[in-house]
């Protein structure tokens, strides 16, 4: 960044903002980069401002029982705030003085008052000087207030962030992500530009008092008629505002329904294409859009009437003020024109400035109170440690995550009793709700010496993670004591990657030691992964390390924990995402060897780990089930240990399944020991539905950090179901639009209307910060740990408000170590962290965009022509009247003037009455122009219709775009087009265009009238208009680029907050809060640099506009004074209209800039509409299907299938030289893949994580850029359409897709099948019992990714879709990744039965599933290494041979059948596993 010219600028340069000229010149000539932006002044740095406010807030906290944040702000900013307020008041006072001078000028032209004619020129100079003074006062004052507002926002931003890092975990569990983002976005944004309006709350009453005093002198009591009318207009506008809010509230729900489906479609676009659901999704979204647009139109009409009210009130306020006085006493023109000028100022003050000021104070004080409450919340308390302690001791430790649960339990129980469930089962309730008031940990005791390994195991939700949190001090014990040195290192269960290099993530601010670093890299098996990157360990990782696989992220997190030199290492299930071989190697080399002399506590469920641990602690339901050595476990609990070791290959199971088995075993033995509750009662599954369909689930922050901790405390009830606290009065649409640009995009979306109160929702809590920290969003498809293939899409849900697509950090802050923080920003590194495409659209909206927008809807052209015709007609009529009255005979001046002055006439008569009538007509014409009912409503209506067409075209384009194009985009960027940009097209653009057209036509009309009255003025008008157009074009190039850079700079602030929250436990464990506060301040300073420069250039432009007009007004004043003879009416009309033109023309120019800015949304939409389509025309003609385009049967005109017209008939696949890429210009992910599959054969895909197994399945569906050929039953994929090709496959994807809709819609979106057929399939896959327990059965509405269903049930839904599709080839991509044994057996059985004659291609990590395959395709380094039977693979040295255990190997040879039978009997022992485990095993 460059040093700012402001530092060396002179007073004159600062006053006129001339120091911004270099950036304006550069922005006009070329595209601005971040390197062109000026550094911020030191007074605006986040460090200084936050320190200043923090000091005052601490003083406030120390001195008072009820501290007030506004007092701290007052002490920091009050005097500057008042100084600029006084300048603003003086500038506004000049507006009240100007009409007095205007009146004197008009009076000097009275034929009977020739004495004053000589001073008219001096009065004109005085009037012009007032304009100059006003310009010099108002602009610095407005800029100064904007600047103070910016400083207040920065200081409070920093204060909130620092407080967030200090909050206790209990508090974080009660705060939603939406609330935090709301504090930092909607609430604080009110200070930036709103502060300039705040002073009008006292300026307007003083101004109105002054104006009414001056009007009283002119019109006496009748002046109050005009004021009364303006007050009525203000109340009328307030009523319209309330009506508009009512429509917006209704519409907000409809918009959110549409955005839910749209976001689900975007996030799961690969599944939508795989299922061929493009038409169904398009129809579903368009239907919702239609309903939404009905309410949009109503709201737009109300807003139109509100906008028109301001325009037409101008004429009536003058009319009502003047008419009573004129009828009673008569009136002269001087009073009329003076009154008109006063009323213009009065109208703006009463109907605009004062309501805006009141709203600003209301919003600002509300925001300050919210921030004040937040800043007083309970903080995290650091435990007192003894640094000389070498042992870790816990004595009788008991802890609760949440307090006051007893009352909540009673209330929820009462609610349940009062609510009747439709199936009549009133006992359906939380089966584990009795645990609600129980501690998460109870009477825990253990002691480990230095260098020992304690293995912690236990059932799901037993409190394993909570135990580590209590040791770290995150969870405060309510009883007992903990003793250790306090030098802790921590590895979270869900890996957290901060933006930066791999090296920075591992070192994490600790001093760099080359030998230690290399040892850790080697022990964590990262050497091979790092060697694959061109920049090795200096590669910059973006958003959450999304370009890495889950295993790579897990190993980097582990390496970070191991690299730190600590006394105690807390490892929370660090191996969950590693394959069996890698896990074994890391455990041996890292945990057992490298850390041999360190004290370690490892959360694990592996028998191998338990055997090697010095001590074992097994937890169950928060209590100690066993503590001792492994040999003691075998002696004291022989039944338990033998049960676990009785499972074949227990350690080979996935971590989820091991936890499931462990949970079931512990519960079985604890129940047998206690004999308390019957097992069947415990496994009852249930749910309940809220009374109000719109009630939504609580989305608190602690959940986001730790939904995966799966506490035995259960889902909250309807008391806390919203994204904001239950008692929040914030409007619905406001809370639903505040979302971070992160992977946890669900806060943008409305929550479900269904609350599951049974075990199926165990572990799925609100979207809280605690959930965020453990990386579980709770919504399938939005989890953090994505596989390598999926991660390349870089898709995460983004905000709909104020978010552009930029990754968290504006730069890599340290090149070598996280210890040092550079002061200079490296722009190259900044570009690397830009995760989304920077908008590649021109700085100024092109004429082509305007032309496309106008022609998108034919009626729009006719409406614009109609507007022009009406305007020309109005101007023509006004000119005719003007010419007629110009030629009308004049009356005798003497008697009439005397009579007028003596007020003997009760009517409006003067010698220049013709001019007065002309002005009355001009006022009426302007009013008609402003009211514009004949053109305004059709214009607004047509522009909304254009928005409808654009949305339809964009939706169709996105659904038909190839994945290679979508892979280059970010889901947040796509969703922003459908949310933010469509909202602009619906709401802002129509009214802004209407205002712009209104203002331009008013200015043109006024200029024509003035020019006709005084032709010389037209000569002055032409250069002024040219100057305006040139100045606008000059400024627009730079301002739009600065605004874009400012928008891009805003996203890192919010993303940094979310990133910090995800890793909050890690930050605290490593003591890196100051480092991350510095990073946050850097992100704030980057945004401030852009915003401050934008504010400065905007003020430069506004000031130049006013200066040009002041010159124009000086010219008009002297032309009219010097060229007008005896005609006070002509001078009055010219000067009054000229003064009116000034404000209107400035407004019009600003509106034109707003239109250009909003049209960028249209440009972005057109960019999406112009995306390529993926449809590939078949090389051979295709005969249409007999049953229509949605038929389950494809009839292909092909020589291979003429005898049997049903295709595919057998499922034979031949793959020849298949090469696949994610994007056309990218590297090949798969190269020259060739093999063939016989009909009905089962083929397993083998290979390491990231080898391309999932990619191959995507290539079969033509979801990637592919070369080569695939044939199914002799039909080449080039000879048929994409839809026909994809319908040949049944798909069970790794990422389960359940969209918001009924069960029926989810199973059969095209409505091809009747209920009988759907129920038959539901029976086959074991879904009937699940569906029947919901009210409405097939018509029950699933929302929020089907969160009421377990992951296993969702997989069964996918299976049912495949059965209904009648596909002959089934593709399964790790279908059992998160399944419990019961659901897994159902899926295996169904596949065997329903797809007995089908070809099955399976990508799976479970050994027992792979054993059923006849052949295996081994993929290594993007190529096929082997394609053989499993027996042949085992006879050779291969990766598969190393991974498979001896017991599994036995199943493949002569005794295979009996072995299989034995295996089944063991799995059958789990038949009593409850649905709770099914839910708990999912991520």
Swiss-Prot record:
Residues 1-77, 147-195, 244-298, 359-859, 942-992, 1037-1097, 1154-1483 are cytoplasmic. Residues 1473-1483 have a biased composition (Acidic residues). SMART domains: AAA. There is a cross-link at residue 688 (Glycyl lysine isopeptide (Lys-Gly) (interchain with G-Cter in ubiquitin)). A lipid is attached at residues 524, 1398 (S-palmitoyl cysteine). Glycans are attached at residues 895, 901-902, 911. GO terms for molecular function: ABC-type transporter activity; ATP binding; ATP hydrolysis activity; bicarbonate transmembrane transporter activity; chloride channel activity; chloride channel inhibitor activity; chloride transmembrane transporter activity; intracellularly ATP-gated chloride channel activity. This is Cystic fibrosis transmembrane conductance regulator. It comes from Atelerix albiventris (Middle-African hedgehog).
């Amino acid at each position: 960044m460059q040093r700012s010219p402001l530092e060396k600028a002179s007073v004159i340069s600062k006053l006129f903002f001339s120091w911004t000229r270099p950036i304006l010149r550069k922005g006009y000539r070329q595209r601005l980069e971040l390197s062109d932006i000026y550094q911020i002044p030191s007074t605006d740095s986040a460090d200084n401002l936050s320190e200043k406010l923090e000091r005052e807030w601490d003083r406030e906290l120390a001195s008072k029982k009820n501290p007030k944040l506004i007092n701290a702000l007052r002490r920091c900013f009050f005097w500057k705030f008042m100084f600029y307020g006084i300048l603003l008041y003086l500038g506004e006072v000049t507006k009240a003085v100007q009409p007095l001078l205007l009146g004197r000028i008009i009076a000097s032209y009275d034929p009977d008052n020739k004495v004053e004619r000589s001073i008219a020129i001096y009065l004109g100079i005085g009037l012009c000087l007032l304009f100059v003074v006003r310009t010099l006062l108002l602009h610095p004052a407005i800029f100064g207030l904007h600047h103070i507002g910016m400083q207040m926002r920065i200081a409070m931003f920093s204060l909130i962030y620092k407080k967030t890092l200090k909050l206790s975990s209990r508090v974080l569990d009660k705060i939603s992500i939406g609330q935090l983002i709301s504090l930092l976005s909607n609430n604080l944004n009110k200070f930036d530009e709103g502060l300039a309006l705040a002073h009008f709350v006292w300026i307007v009453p003083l101004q109105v008092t002054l104006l009414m005093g001056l009007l009283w002198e002119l019109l006496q009591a009748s002046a109050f008629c005009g004021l009364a009318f303006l007050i009525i207009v203000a109340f009328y506008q307030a009523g319209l505002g309330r009506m508009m809010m009512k429509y917006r509230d209704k519409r907000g729900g409809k918009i959110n329904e549409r955005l839910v489906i749209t976001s689900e479609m975007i996030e799961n676009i690969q599944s939508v294409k795989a299922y061929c659901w493009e038409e169904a999704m398009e129809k579903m979204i368009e239907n919702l859009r239609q309903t939404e647009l009905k309410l949009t139109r109503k709201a737009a009409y109300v807003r139109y009437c509100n906008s028109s009210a301001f325009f037409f009130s101008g004429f009536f306020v003058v009319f009502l003020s003047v008419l009573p006085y004129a009828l009673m006493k008569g009136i002269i023109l001087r009073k009329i024109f003076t009154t008109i000028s006063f009323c213009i100022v009065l109208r703006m003050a009463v109907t605009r400035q004062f309501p805006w000021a009141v709203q600003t104070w209301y919003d600002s004080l509300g925001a300050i109170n919210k921030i004040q409450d937040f800043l007083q919340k309970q903080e995290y308390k650091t435990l007192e440690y003894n640094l000389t302690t070498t042992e870790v001791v816990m004595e009788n430790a008991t802890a609760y995550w949440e307090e006051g649960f007893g009352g909540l339990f009673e209330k929820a129980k009462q609610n349940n009793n009062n609510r009747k469930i439709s199936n009549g089962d009133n006992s359906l309730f939380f089966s584990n709700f009795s645990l609600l008031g129980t501690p998460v940990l109870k009477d825990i005791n253990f002691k480990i010496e230095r260098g020992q390994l304690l293995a912690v195991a236990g059932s799901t939700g037993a409190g394993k993670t909570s135990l580590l949190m209590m040791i770290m001090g995150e969870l405060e014990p309510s009883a007992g004591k903990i003793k250790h040195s306090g030098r802790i290192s921590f590895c979270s269960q869900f890996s957290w990657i901060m933006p930066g290099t791999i090296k920075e993530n591992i070192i994490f601010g600790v001093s760099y030691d080359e030998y230690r670093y290399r040892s850790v890299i080697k022990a964590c098996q990262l050497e091979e992964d790092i060697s694959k990157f061109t920049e090795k360990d200096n590669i910059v990782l973006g958003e959450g390390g999304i370009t890495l696989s889950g295993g790579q992220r897990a190993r980097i997190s582990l390496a970070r924990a191991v690299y730190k030199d600590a006394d105690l290492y807390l490892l929370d299930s660090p191996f969950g995402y590693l394959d069996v071989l890698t896990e074994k190697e890391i455990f041996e080399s890292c945990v057992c060897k490298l850390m041999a002399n360190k004290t370690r506590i490892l959360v694990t469920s592996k028998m191998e780990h338990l055997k090697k641990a010095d001590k074992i602690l097994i937890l169950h339901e928060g209590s100690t089930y066993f503590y001792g050595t492994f040999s003691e476990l075998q002696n004291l609990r022989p039944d338990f240990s033998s049960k676990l070791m009785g499972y074949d290959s227990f350690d080979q199971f996935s971590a989820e399944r091991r936890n499931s088995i462990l949970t079931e075993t512990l519960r079985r033995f604890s129940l047998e020991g206690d004999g308390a509750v019957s097992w069947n009662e415990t496994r009852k599954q249930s749910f309940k539905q809220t009374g109000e369909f719109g009630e939504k689930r609580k989305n608190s922050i602690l959940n986001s950090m730790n939904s995966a901790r799966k506490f035995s405390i259960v889902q909250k009830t309807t008391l806390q179901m919203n994204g904001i606290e239950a008692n929040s009065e914030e409007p619905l649409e406001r809370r639903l639009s505040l979302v971070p640009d992160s992977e946890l995009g669900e806060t943008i979306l409305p929550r479900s209307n269904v609350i599951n109160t049974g075990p199926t929702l165990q572990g799925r809590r609100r979207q809280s910060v605690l959930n965020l920290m453990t990386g579980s969003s709770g919504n399938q498809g939005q989890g953090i740990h994505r596989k390598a293939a999926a991660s390349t899409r870089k898709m995460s849900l983004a905000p709909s408000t104020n978010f552009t697509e930029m990754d968290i950090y504006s730069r890599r802050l340290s090149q070598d170590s996280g210890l040092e923080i550079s002061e200079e920003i490296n722009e190259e590194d900044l570009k690397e962290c830009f995760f989304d495409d920077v908008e590649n659209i021109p700085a100024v909206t092109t004429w082509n965009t305007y032309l496309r927008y106008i022609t998108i809807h034919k009626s729009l052209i006719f409406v614009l022509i109609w507007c022009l015709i009406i305007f020309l007609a109005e101007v023509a009529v006004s000119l005719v009247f003007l010419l007629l009255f110009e030629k009308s005979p004049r009356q005798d001046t003497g008697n009439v003037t005397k009579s007028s002055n003596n007020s003997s006439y009760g009517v409006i008569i003067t010698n220049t009455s013709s001019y007065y009538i002309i002005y009355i007509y001009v006022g009426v014409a302007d009013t008609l122009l402003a009211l514009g009912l004949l053109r305004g409503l059709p214009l607004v209506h047509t522009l909304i219709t254009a928005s409808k067409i654009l949305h339809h075209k964009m939706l169709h384009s996105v659904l038909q775009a190839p994945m290679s194009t979508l892979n280059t985009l970010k889901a947040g960027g796509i969703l922003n087009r459908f949310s933010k940009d469509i909202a602009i097209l619906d709401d802002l653009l129509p009214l802004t265009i209407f205002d712009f057209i209104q203002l331009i036509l008013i200015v043109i009309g006024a200029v024509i009238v003035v020019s006709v009255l005084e032709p010389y003025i037209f000569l002055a008008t032409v250069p002024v208009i040219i100057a305006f157009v040139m100045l606008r074009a000059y400024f627009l190039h730079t301002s739009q680029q600065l605004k874009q850079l400012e928008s891009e700079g805003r996203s890192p602030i919010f993303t940094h907050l979310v990133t910090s929250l995800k890793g909050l436990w890690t930050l605290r464990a490593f003591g890196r809060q100051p480092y991350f506060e510095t990073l946050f301040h850097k992100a704030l300073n980057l945004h401030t640099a852009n915003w401050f420069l934008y504010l400065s250039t905007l003020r430069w432009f506004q000031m130049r506009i006013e200066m040009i007009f002041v010159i124009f007004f000086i010219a008009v004043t002297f032309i009219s004074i010097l060229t007008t003879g005896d005609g006070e009416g002509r001078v009055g009309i010219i000067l009054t209209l000229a003064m009116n033109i000034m404000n209107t023309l400035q407004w019009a120019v600003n509106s034109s800039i707003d239109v250009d800015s909003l049209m960028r949304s249209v440009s972005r939409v057109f960019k999406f509409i112009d995306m390529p389509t993926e449809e590939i025309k078949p090389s051979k003609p295709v005969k249409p299907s007999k049953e229509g385009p949605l038929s389950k049967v494809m009839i292909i005109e092909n020589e291979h299938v003429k005898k049997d017209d049903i295709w595919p008939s057998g499922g034979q696949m031949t793959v020849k030289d298949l090469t696949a890429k994610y994007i056309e210009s990218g590297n090949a992910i798969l190269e020259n893949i060739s093999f063939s599959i016989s009909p009905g054969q089962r083929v397993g895909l083998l290979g390491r994580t990231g080898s391309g197994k999932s990619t191959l399945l995507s290539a079969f569906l033509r979801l990637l850029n592919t070369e080569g050929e695939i044939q199914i039953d002799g039909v080449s994929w080039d000879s048929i359409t994409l839809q026909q090709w994809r319908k040949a496959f049944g798909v069970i994807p790794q990422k389960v897709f359940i969209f918001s809709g009924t069960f029926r819609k989810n199973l059969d979106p095209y409505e091809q099948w009747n209920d009988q057929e759907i129920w038959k399939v539901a029976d086959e896959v074991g879904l009937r019992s699940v569906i029947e327990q919901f009210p409405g059965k097939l018509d029950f509405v699933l929302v929020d990714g089907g969160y009421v269903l377990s992951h296993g049930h969702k997989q069964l839904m996918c299976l049912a879709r495949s059965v209904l599709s009648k596909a002959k080839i089934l593709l399964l991509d790790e279908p059992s990744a998160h399944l419990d044994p019961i659901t897994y057996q159902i899926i295996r059985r169904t596949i065997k039965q329903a797809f007995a004659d089908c070809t099955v291609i399976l990508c799976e990590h479970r050994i027992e599933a792979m054993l059923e395959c006849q052949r295996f395709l081994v993929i290594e380094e993007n190529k096929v290494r082997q394609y053989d039977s499993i027996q042949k693979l085992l006879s050779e040295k291969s990766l598969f041979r190393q991974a498979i255990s001896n017991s599994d190997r036995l199943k493949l040879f002569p005794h295979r059948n009996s072995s299989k039978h034995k295996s089944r009997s063991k799995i059958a022992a789990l038949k009593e596993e409850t649905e709770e485990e099914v839910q708990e095993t999912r991520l």
